[in-house]
C-alpha cells in the first residue's frame, strides 16, 4: 500500500459514502411524500383493482371500521357467478388496506384469472367508538352471509385471511361453519391452547 493508493481508496470510500447518504435521504423523502399524498387522498385502499363497496360496517347497528368490497374484474377477465367466491380479509397493517391485491399477481389477481368472483374486506384507519373484536367478527359474518346471498348457486365462499386476519378467518369459520367454505390462513401462526377469554 502506497500513500497515493491509500488516498485514492479513502477518496473513493468518502465519495461512495456521500452518494449513499444522499440516496438514503432521498428515499426517505420520497417515502414521506408518498405517505402525505396517500393521506391527502383519504387513505384509500392500495388495491390495484377497481372495486365497489357492497357493505360498509360503519353503518351497522354495532358500527365497525370494516367494509366489504366486490372486486371488479379487469378488461379481458370473465368471472362465473356460479364458481366459488373468494373473500379475502386484509391484515390491519402496512401502508393501508389492500396488500392482498396491490398487484396483478396477487391473491385477488390469481382468483380473478381463474374465473372466481372476489370480495375483499378492508379496514378504515380509525376504529368506531366502542368497537370490539366481537363486533368485527359479527360484521365479517354478515359480509360472508351477503356473499352467499349474491352467489346462491355457488359453493360456500373460500375465506383467505392474511396475517392477523388469518385469526379472524379462523374465528369466523369456527363460529359459522354453515356459511364458510375452505379457509386459507397466510402468515398467521395458530396457538390452539394459548390465551384466555378476557386477556
Residue ranges: model-predicted function:
Residues 1-199:
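N-terminal cap/leader regions of alpha/beta-hydrolase-fold enzymes
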